Amino acid sequence: MVKVGFVSLGCNKNLVDSEIMMGACKEAGFEITPNAEDADVIVINTCGFINDAKQESIDTILEMAEYKNKKCKFLIVTGCLSQRYKDDILKELPEVDAILGVKEMLKLPNVIKKLYEGESKLQVFDDKPTFVYTSSMPRLIATPKFYAYIKIAEGCNNRCSYCSIPLIRGNYTSRYIDDIIQEARKLSEDGYKEIVLTAQDTTKYGIDIYQKKMLATLLQKLSEIDNIKWIRFLYSYPEDIDDELLNIVKSLPKVVKYFDIPIQHINNRILKLMNRKTSSEGIKELIQRIRSAFDEVVIRTTVMVGFPTESEDEFEELYEFVKWAKFDRLGAFMYSQEEGTPAADLPQTDDETKVKRYERILNLQRKISLERNRKRISKKYEVVIEGRDRNNFYIARSQFEAPEVDGKIIVFSKRKLLPGEFVVVKILDAFEYDLVGEVI
């Protein structure tokens, strides 16, 4: 039996795509292996969002190509990098045997068969509208047994001036609510306790097919499914977080009190240049509304430094805003010039300035994170055990930590704990990103 190995790079949305391709391959009779050295075929699902991600994708392709000197017969590249640079990959990377676009993932088993039949240098792309998966498609979940992602929409209509995702993924296309509910029910029946909703923009869910935002309705329906303990949604846009959504999050116990809101910047001129649909005043007002609506809530954000023409004063405005907002979690990016985007044609900020601003923001956030975490000492939280770390301590998350992107809670326990088990811990100590607690 042909063994197929997968490497999934980038975001959780890409991971869902990898899970669908793994499911399609398994259904077609291939064996899925987690070990590249055992694979007859290696599939790399690439990321192409920013320059660092592109470089990681290229480095991974070259690393996996080394296995062609051993057991691996074919190397296949798919994902955002292949969609964006389909004319360059086969030419510049002769080790690659086939490339697929982001809309052709279900064709992967057929591509593998064609390679075994003697075809080579295959390019499989389609100009059809955005691909959206359904609950009836095969999917092999790669996350631990206690949480799973559900991609509720594909593509993006926001057209931020720095972002190439709409060029790669197409227009915003929602899945139907009934189909999402069907998938969530199946996950619940299979034992998954946490559902994480993801999309390029979860807060615009439903606008294209229902002519109104339907995330609040979706959360309500998901909360009615038995055995699901936590429901989380990521990638919220500030202009779409309204009172209806806040009230739903507040009123539904299963919906975690956690908001992931990438704001990118706070200066109004920069926001306008970014083609963001919000304002400094709107962002500040939203943060105050969220914090006043909940007894305890976590806000995560992402900011970008070094955007074209960003002045020192405009960066200082962002810096002072971060100091004021005291985000629980903050990710920072240095602006990446993406060809084909409006921002790429603006006067660019030099790399040295970008690095300095990036480091200043991260140093500030480390202090804020420690301050926020220390406020959690002596509090009690229900957590899910994820496993053990290299020191054999248990690691866990509460509702206030999203999987993969946030810190962890190191847990001491006198009894044996199992991955996926929910226990209550008391927080004993705090660090910049992690907490320490004991089972009570």
Swiss-Prot record:
Keyword 4Fe-4S: yes
The protein's required cofactors: [4Fe-4S] cluster
Biological process annotations from GO: tRNA modification
Signal peptide per UniProt: none
Domain MTTase N-terminal: 2-117
InterPro entries: Elp3/MiaA/NifB-like_rSAM, Methylthiotransferase, Methylthiotransferase_CS, Methylthiotransferase_N, Methylthiotransferase_N_sf, NA-bd_OB-fold, Ribosomal_uS12_MeSTrfase_RimO, rSAM
Pfam families: Radical_SAM, TRAM_2, UPF0004
GO MF annotation: an example: 4 iron, 4 sulfur cluster binding
Example of a GO cellular component annotation carried by this entry: cytosol
Major localization listed first in the record, in broad terms: cytoplasm
Assigned EC number: 2.8.4.4
Binding residues annotated for [4Fe-4S] cluster 2, in chain numbering: C156, C160, C163
Purpose: Catalyzes the methylthiolation of an aspartic acid residue of ribosomal protein uS12.
Similarity-based family: Belongs to the methylthiotransferase family. RimO subfamily.
Protein name: Ribosomal protein uS12 methylthiotransferase RimO
Organism of provenance: Caldicellulosiruptor saccharolyticus (strain ATCC 43494 / DSM 8903 / Tp8T 6331)
